[in-house]
Amino acid sequence: MKVKSEGKTLSVPNPDYPTFKKDMLVRGISISDDTTTLDDILNTLFNILFLAIFLFALYKALSWYSSTFHTVRHTGVHFSDIAGMDEVKKDMESIVKEMKNPEESKKRVKGIILEGPPGNGKTLFARALAEESGVNFLATKGADFQGAVMGLGAMKVKMLFKKARNKKPCIVFIDEFDSIGEKRNYAGSGIDKENNRILTTLLNEMDGFSSGKGVLVVAATNSFQSLDPALIRPGRFDLKYTISNPDQKTRMELLEIYGKGKTFSSDLTPQILATVFDGLSSAAIESVINEAEEIRRSYNKEAITIECIVASASKCREKLNIKIKKN
C-alpha cells in the first residue's frame, strides 16, 4: 500500500488491523491500496479486450456478408437438364408462372422444402426454378449461420433476408437446412440456445414478408422429420417435394447423360445397367460410371465391362457407402 504525508509518498506493507485506516486519517495521512488500483487496471483491460473481440466478430460478420451472400442472375440450369422427376417439374411450373406474374396470383407460397437423400439434385431443382422464373438466385447453407460467437447467427439471418429483399424478385436457397431448422431444445446447452435464436429469427423474417412480395425461400434437407413444427406449418413452408433416388426410367436417362462418350460392352445394355444401379443416388451412379471408365483405361480395355462396374462400385463404396446390385 502507499502512504502520503507531508508531500512524500511511501510504499509500505499493509498492517491490516481493523482501525488502521481510521488512525491514519486522524493523523492527516492519506493512503491508497495498490490492490484496488490493480483490479481497476485489470477490469479496464478486460473491457478493452471484450470490445476488441466484439468489433472483430462484427468485422468478420460484415466480411462474411459481403463474401458469402452472392446473388446470381442466371444459374444456367433448366428443368430440361434434370433427368426424371416429371411430376415435380410439372408442379413447379405453376410456381414459375406465379413468380413471373405475381399480380395474377391470388395466393403464393412463401417457402418450399425439398427433402430426400443426398445426391439426387435438390440444389439443381432450386437453381432450375430460379432460372425458369427469371429471378435472382441467392444460395447459402445452414452451416454458414453457425459459429463460435453467440448472437452472430441470428444477425446473419437478418443480413440474408435484407439482401434478398434488396434483390427481389429473388429465390433464397438454404441447403443443409436441418442444421438450423431442427426442433428447438429449450433445456439444452449454449449451442442449443444459439440455434434456438437462429431459428426464431428465421421464423420472424419469414413472417415479416408477405407472399407475393418477390421473395421465395427454398430449403433442402435430408431429414424432414427433424425440422421444427413451427417451420413447416402453413404460411411458412407450404409445399414439400421429395427428391428421391432415381427410378428405373430416370436411371436410364442418367445413363444416357453420364455414359455419353463412353463405350460399354454388349452385355451391358441400358436396361441391365439401370437395374444394376437400382438403389443408388444420381450422384453415386455418376461416380461409379466415371470410375469405371478410369478402370477401363488403366486395363486398356476397349469397353466398360461388368468387371469394371463391380470394381468401380467397390472403390466408390468406401467413399460413398453405396452397394451395387448384380444380376
Feature locations, PLM:
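AAA+ ATPase "lid" subdomain C-terminal helix
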Residues: T275-E307, S314-I322
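Extended, hydrophilic extramembrane loops/domains of integral membrane proteins
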Residues: K4-T35
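Phosphoinositide-dependent membrane-docking surfaces
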Residues: M1
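Walker A/P-loop NTP-binding motif of AAA+ ATPase domains
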Residues: S66-T275, L280, A292
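Proline-centered turn/helix-capping motifs that create local helix->coil transitions or kinks
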Residues: L62, T263-F264, N321
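Intrinsically disordered, low-complexity N-terminal extensions of AAA+/P-loop NTPases
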Residues: T9, K325-N327
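Interdomain "pre-motor" coupling segment immediately N-terminal to P-loop NTPase/helicase cores
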Residues: D34-T71
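Hydrophobic alpha-helical transmembrane segments in multi-pass membrane proteins
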Residues: L51-F56, K167, I171-D175, S287
